[in-house]
Swiss-Prot record:
Name of the protein in question: Chaperonin GroEL 1
InterPro entries per record: Chaperonin_Cpn60_CS, Cpn60/GroEL, Cpn60/GroEL/TCP-1, GroEL-like_apical_dom_sf, GROEL-like_equatorial_sf, TCP-1-like_intermed_sf
Record's subcellular location: Cytoplasm
Family listed: Belongs to the chaperonin (HSP60) family.
PANTHER family: 60 KDA HEAT SHOCK PROTEIN, MITOCHONDRIAL
GO cellular component, one term: cytoplasm
Pfam families xref list: Cpn60_TCP1
Species assigned in the record: Prochlorococcus marinus subsp. pastoris (strain CCMP1986 / NIES-2087 / MED4)
Predominant cellular place of this UniProt entry's protein: cytoplasm
Length: 581
């Protein structure tokens, strides 16, 4: 594909245009008086969102170089979302102002490299001050953080606070859609562990990049699976039952993984595969815990159990399993509650007789996972659009609350960033060089989130900043008053602010040091088929793939591709895949 090249100021200006386009759409979503963004969907009703990452992902620009800028700032939002679960709009706002200030100084003759060094030096100062101002969160603060992150919605704050109180920080909280109009909290058995899907092709929700299995059957084994030959009998039985299927094994690789993906994508079997958590002997213990939770039999090599002898009675079950790229959450049925409690009591006895502190810690971790349970927040709404909106707000609020528990909180509303900006300004050397200018870029950027919060609430951002500095109090955008934001319960998770700063400086520094941008030139869309083309003519079909022992993929022969008449590909009939074919 031909490439478009852009150099020097031209490339940076085009990148900045893309960054500004995305940032201007995103920054209306910050603060308690934030505005919504409506996103058209190809199918179904439009989405109404107030989440920076979601908005940024939807924007594509005609100019290839500007679109690179749009994708770079979208990367900032996505990375912050992935790491902290919140703070995407703050990260976007910071990136935009840093890029604007950086490019303005470069146009005036500043050295990009020295600016970058100054920005990184300023960032280190800010992070050190941020850590010193952070305070540990207590029970009453959880509701405050959740409420602020939910845009001031006290109902969301209350339900998250209640869920946290019941399952504790070791438990699991999941958010799902409800059939009723009310948002409810339900506590059930379950656990999560740090292993994700073995292949991204198992994803069922492309937007959230997760795999969800409703009422699945579960095979649990400590064996490595590299071929599905031994699993054909049980796979056929599961297919007949029309249930989703999860394979939890020491490893799933090679031909076995390829064949599962093929069957998943062809609609033959709704399946996913996950590697077992932990390592060595602890891996088997973890699998035993999961087997008890789900009512499964652990198919173990130690007991000479063979995969080809597995029956439906050996499989476990769950209400729902959610798998991301690095985490699996199991929502179990309550009928295993007594068995789980017995297991917990047994583990507690092991703790008492174990001498190794390390082993005690590991056993206590298992107890916490089993006993913590799962809190289900069931989101109710009158319409599908409202449902999606509320669910996204609750997920953001939940992520922010977890981040607050991890690293503590600071004064919200951008107040802490303003304080640090003043401290950074006061520490500035009275010299004029490019490195110092880079520090100044950070100093000024720290004011921008509060300016935008004020603007979204209908106030002049510059006036609000001046009043905050004069009064020594924070700005409460809910009521337009200047207050002690800690006492008002307006708190931000330290982790969210830290990651927003780190991610924004990282991308902004890369952009201002960019000299050349290379992008694909979009090819013009050709008319379907072309003159005289047979619309149904096409590539000779792929002949039917060999049967899969009852689970065969339907043959694909004869499915011509429109517009490519006369270019037949030789059939591939009879090429059965090994194992289940």
């Amino acid at each position: 594909m031909p490439k478009q090249l852009s150099f020097s100021n031209e490339s940076r200006e085009a990148l900045e245009k893309g960054i500004n386009t995305v940032a201007n759409a995103v920054k209306v979503t910050i603060g308690p008086k934030a505005k919504n963004v409506v996103i058209e969907r190809k199918f179904g009703s439009p989405d109404i969102v107030r989440d920076g990452s979601t908005v940024a992902k939807e924007i594509n620009l005609d100019n290839p170089i500007s679109n690179l800028g749009a994708k770079l700032i979208e990367q900032v939002a996505s990375k912050t979302k992935e790491s902290a679960g919140d703070g995407t709009t703050t990260a976007t706002i910071l990136t935009q102002i840093m890029v604007q200030e950086g490019l303005k100084n470069i146009a005036a003759g500043a050295s990009p490299i020295e600016l970058k060094k100054g920005m990184e030096k300023g960032l280190n100062f800010v992070l050190e001050k941020l850590r010193s101002k952070s305070i540990k969160i207590n029970g009453s603060d959880i509701k405050k953080v959740a409420t602020v992150s939910a845009g001031g919605d006290e109902d969301i704050g209350s339900i998250i606070s209640k869920a946290m109180d019941i399952v504790t920080s070791d438990g699991v909280i999941t958010v799902e859609e409800s059939q009723s109009l009310e948002t409810e909290l339900d506590i059930t058995e379950g656990m999560s562990f740090d292993r994700g899907y073995s292949s991204p092709y198992f994803v069922t929700d492309q937007e959230r990049q997760i795999c969800e299995l409703e009422n699945p059957k579960i095979l649990i084994t400590d064996q490595k699976i590299s071929t599905l030959t031994n699993l054909v009998p049980i796979l056929e039985e599961v297919q007949k039952s029309a249930s989703p299927f999860l394979i939890l094994a020491e490893d799933i690789e090679g031909e076995a993984l390829t064949t599962l993906v093929l069957n998943k994508n062809s609609g033959v079997l709704n399946v996913s595969a996950v590697r077992a958590p932990s390592f060595g002997e602890r891996r088997k213990a973890a699998l035993e815990d999961i087997a008890i939770l789900t009512g499964a039999k652990l198919i173990s090599e130690d007991q000479s159990m063979k995969l080809e002898e597995v029956t439906l009675n050996d499989l476990g079950k769950a209400k729902k399993i959610t798998i991301s790229k690095d985490k699996t959450t199991i929502v179990a049925f309550d009928d295993t509650k007594d068995l789980v409690q017995e297991r917990v009591e047994k583990l507690k006895r092991e703790v008492e007789i174990t001498e190794s502190e390390y082993d005690k810690d590991k056993i206590n971790e298992r107890i916490a996972k089993l006993a913590g349970g799962v809190a289900l927040i069931k989101v109710g709404a009158a319409t599908e659009t409202e449902m999606k909106y509320k669910k996204l707000r609750i997920e953001d609020s939940l992520n922010a609350t977890k981040a607050a528990i991890e690293e503590g909180v600071v004064s919200g509303g951008g107040q802490t960033l303003i304080e640090i900006s003043n401290e950074l300004s006061n520490s500035r050397k009275e010299i004029s060089d490019d490195l110092t200018t880079g520090i100044d870029i950070i100093t000024n950027a720290l004011l921008e989130p509060t300016k935008q919060i004020a603007k979204n609430a209908g106030f002049n951002g510059d006036v609000v900043i001046a009043d905050i500095k004069r009064l020594g109090k924070g700005f409460n955008a809910n009521n337009g008053e200047y207050e002690n934001l800690n006492e008002s319960g307006i708190l931000d998770p330290t982790k969210v602010i830290r990651l927003a700063l780190q991610d924004s400086v990282s991308i902004a520094a890369m952009i201002i040091t960019t000299e050349v941008a290379v992008a694909d030139i979009p090819e013009p869309e050709a008319a379907p088929g072309g003159p005289g083309a047979d619309p149904m003519g096409g590539m000779g079909g792929m002949g039917g793939m060999g049967g899969m022992g009852g689970m065969g993929m339907p043959g694909m022969g004869g499915m011509g591709m429109p517009g490519m008449g006369g270019m037949g590909m030789p059939g591939m009939g009879g090429m059965g895949m090994p194992g289940m074919m």
